[in-house]
A protein has these predicted regions:
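Central cavity-lining transmembrane alpha-helices of secondary-active solute carriers
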Residues: 45-59, 109-113
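Residue-level signature of the transmembrane alpha-helical cores
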Residues: 8, 71-77, 81, 97, ...
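Cytoplasmic helix-loop-helix junction between adjacent transmembrane helices
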Residues: 101-134
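Conserved MFS/SLC helix-loop-helix module at the cytosolic interface between two early adjacent transmembrane helices
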Residues: 53-89
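Interfacial helix-cap and linker-helix signal at transmembrane-aqueous boundaries
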Residues: 26-27, 61-62, 146-154
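Extracellular/periplasmic helix-loop-helix junction of adjacent transmembrane segments
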Residues: 22-53
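C-terminal membrane-cytosol helix-exit motif in multi-pass small-molecule transporters
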Residues: 164-182
C-alpha cells in the first residue's frame, strides 16, 4: 500500500515541472504567442498554489477520516485535473486543470505520510518516511525528463493523458491493496 501511495506522490511531484519543456507548446495550444511568456506562468504557479494550499487541510482530514479514501479522492481529483488540462484550448481552462492537479497531488503527500503512522510503530517510521520524501524529490527531478520523453513521441496533451492513466492504475492498486480500512 505504501509503495502505491509513494508512486502516486512521485507522479504528482513530477507534474510540478513536467511542463517546463512543454510550456511553449502549451502556450500555442491555448493561443498565446511566445512573445507573451509571462502570461504562461500560471501554468506552473497554478499547480504549485493548489499543491501547497491543501497540505494542511488534507493532513487534518486524513487524521479524521479513512486515509485510504483520502488517497483515492486525491488521485481522482488529480486525474480530473489532468484530463481538464489535456482538453484545454483556452488559458483559463488550462489553469483550472493545473490547479485541480495541484490540489489532488498536494493532498497525496500528507495522506501518505499519515498512512506511515498507521502502518509502522513510532520507532520504525524513519525509513518509510524517508522513502516517501525521497520518491517525492525523485519525482520532481524526473518530471522534466519524463516530459521530454513524451514530447519526443507526442504532443503536450499526452503528458496529461498519461497522468490520467497512471492515476487510475494507482487508484485501482490502492483500492485493491487497501480493501481493509487503514
Amino acid at each position: 500500500l505504501l509503495s502505491a501511495a509513494s508512486a502516486a506522490v512521485a507522479l504528482a511531484a513530477a507534474d510540478t515541472y513536467v511542463v517546463v519543456l512543454a510550456l511553449t507548446d502549451m502556450m500555442a495550444g491555448v493561443g498565446i504567442g511566445i512573445d507573451a511568456l509571462q502570461r504562461a506562468t500560471p501554468i506552473i504557479s497554478g499547480f504549485l498554489l493548489g499543491y501547497i494550499a491543501v497540505l494542511p487541510l488534507i493532513g487534518r482530514l486524513s487524521d479524521l477520516l479513512d486515509r485510504r479514501r483520502i488517497l483515492l479522492g486525491c488521485l481522482l481529483v488529480f486525474a480530473v485535473g489532468s484530463a481538464v488540462t489535456a482538453l484545454a484550448v483556452e488559458m483559463p481552462v488550462l489553469i483550472t486543470g493545473r490547479v485541480l492537479q495541484g490540489v489532488g497531488g498536494g493532498g497525496l503527500v500528507p495522506a501518505t505520510l499519515a498512512l506511515v503512522a498507521d502502518l509502522w510503530p513510532p520507532h520504525r517510521r524513519g525509513t518509510p518516511l524517508g522513502v516517501v520524501g525521497a520518491v517525492q524529490e525523485l519525482g520532481s527531478v524526473l518530471g522534466p525528463v519524463l516530459g521530454a520523453v513524451v514530447l519526443a513521441w507526442s504532443g503536450w496533451q499526452a503528458i496529461f493523458w498519461l497522468n490520467v492513466a497512471a492515476a487510475l492504475v494507482l487508484y485501482a492498486v490502492i483500492h485493491l491493496l487497501g480493501s481493509r480500512s487503514v
